[in-house]
């Protein structure tokens, strides 16, 4: 029979201290009853002799030192999982909020997951189609990869996340695909935008949503991504599905960690974040991957807003060390009404080279991507020179690069929020834009591929003659 403890020794924000505890374990879940009626859940985060520090998952406002009873469950935080979770919406601690009743779970799993043996991992291959040219063409998302989006306040990362959910699919017509979407610290209107968008597009049927609102307890934000990944791992590794996990906003997760760490009186590290921020982020990001001998995969797109657009801030900085590339959104492109405002040059996908090309996308994919990167870099040089000497004084080739740069931003990077481009459309568009430049400038493409795909753009005079 479980022992029930009456009263608390102190309350500090989301943390409460229980004394005289015996047999408690780190990360153990406790059930707390307030005034004999309201029930709350908490987690033991520290143990000193007979003292246990407990993080309460809900508000502690109505809790007092004498009106609370605490019972140790002897178990870690667990979630009931089932394939029926697809198409359902839950709050930040896994309780259903869509009015469709509780889930009949097939089993209970520890939300902390089990670390994947590096030897058991299979190297990620095959791409995930997003329908967005800047991603599919230049920073291709590979199954089993973790590819974050670095955004900033006011940039359209929510709209981009919704578009990815609407359009994401597996190449080759496979249908064993699902999405787990976790929103942390979002405002109600943003959460409502996601719900409406998924329902109107028809994507909701294969999406499991976890929503932690801005007015929900801060501590829930530390649980939400773990719940989402536990469900994703179950669907991927036990039901052989390919699962895309979108986590937004990881900055809210890190700030929640800072707040809880501060209330525990821990010594802060960079920018006030705890010294274990790196290991906590790694514990989430490293749950992506493919296990050898299992058909399923877990792919992650964590989204984070960089404070003051600072890519050296601890959150994007540490994220970059752990993940396999990044997609960076740019405020200048946003000001030019380019959507999605993906900054091509600092963006990359480290696993892209092994999941594209013949047998995956198209044989010219890598060459086209390399050449577009190279040409767009020269656009920056031409624009810098034009700002000094004036556009009229530029050489003819520099003027051609300016024309290419404008067309590239408006036509290749820019697209309608509901436009779903196939990989063939994306690559053909890339060749069309490269046709604005003379063949002699295309030095990153194999000669045989140039002969097959390159067609120079017609000048106005040539078009009139034809």
Go through the PLM ranges and name each one.
Residues 1-88, 93:
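N-terminal accessory targeting/assembly segments
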Residues 13, 37-39, 49, 106, ...:
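A generic structural motif
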Residues 92, 96, 167:
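Mid-sequence acidic-hydrophobic segments that form the walls
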Residues 20, 56, 93, 101, ...:
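Glycine-rich, histidine-containing beta strand-loop boundary motifs that form or position
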Residues 68-70, 77, 84, 97-146, ...:
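P-loop NTPase nucleotide-binding/switch module
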Residues 13, 49, 94, 116, ...:
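Residues that form or immediately flank small-molecule/cofactor binding pockets and catalytic motifs
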């Amino acid at each position: 029979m479980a022992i029930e403890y009456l009263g608390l020794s102190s309350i500090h924000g989301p943390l409460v201290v229980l004394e005289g505890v015996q047999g408690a374990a780190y990360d153990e879940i406790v059930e707390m009853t307030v005034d004999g009626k309201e029930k709350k859940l908490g987690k033991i985060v520290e143990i000193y002799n007979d003292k246990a520090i407990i993080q309460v998952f809900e508000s502690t406002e109505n809790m007092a030192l004498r009106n609370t009873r605490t019972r140790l469950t002897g178990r870690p935080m667990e979630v009931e999982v089932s394939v029926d979770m697809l198409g359902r919406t839950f709050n930040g601690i896994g309780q259903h909020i869509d009015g469709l009743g509780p889930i009949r779970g097939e089993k209970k799993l520890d939300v902390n997951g089990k670390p994947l043996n590096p030897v058991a991992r299979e190297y990620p291959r095959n791409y995930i189609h997003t329908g967005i040219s800047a991603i599919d063409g230049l920073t291709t998302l590979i199954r089993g990869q973790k590819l974050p989006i670095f955004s900033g306040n006011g940039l359209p990362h929510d709209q981009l996340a919704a578009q990815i959910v609407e359009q994401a699919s597996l190449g080759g017509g496979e249908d064993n695909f699902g999405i787990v979407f976790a929103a942390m610290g979002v405002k109600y209107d943003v959460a409502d935008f996601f719900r409406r968008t998924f329902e109107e597009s028809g994507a909701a049927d294969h999406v499991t949503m976890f929503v932690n609102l801005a007015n929900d307890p801060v501590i829930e934000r530390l649980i939400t991504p773990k719940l989402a990944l536990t469900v994703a791992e179950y669907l991927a590794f036990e039901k052989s599905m390919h699962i895309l996990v979108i986590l937004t906003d990881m900055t809210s997760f890190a700030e929640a960690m800072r707040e809880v760490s501060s209330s525990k009186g821990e010594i802060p590290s960079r920018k006030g974040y705890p010294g274990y921020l790196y290991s906590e982020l790694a514990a989430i990001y490293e749950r992506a991957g493919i296990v050898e001998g299992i058909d399923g995969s877990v792919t992650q797109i964590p989204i984070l807003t960089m404070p003051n657009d600072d890519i050296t801030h601890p959150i994007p900085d540490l994220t970059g060390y752990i993940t396999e590339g990044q997609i960076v959104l740019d405020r200048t492109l946003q000001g030019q009404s380019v959507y999605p405002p993906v900054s091509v040059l600092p963006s990359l996908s480290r696993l892209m080279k092994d999941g594209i090309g013949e047998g995956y996308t198209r044989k010219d994919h890598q060459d086209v991507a390399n050449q577009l990167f190279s040409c767009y870099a020269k656009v920056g040089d031409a624009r810098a020179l034009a700002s000094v000497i004036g556009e009229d004084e530029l050489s003819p080739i520099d003027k051609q690069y300016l024309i290419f740069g404008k067309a590239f931003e408006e036509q290749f990077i820019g697209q309608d929020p509901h436009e779903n481009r196939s990989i063939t459309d994306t690559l053909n568009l890339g060749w069309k834009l490269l046709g604005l430049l003379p063949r002699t400038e295309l030095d990153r493409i194999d000669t045989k591929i140039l002969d097959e795909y390159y067609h120079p753009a017609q000048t106005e005079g040539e078009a009139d003659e034809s």
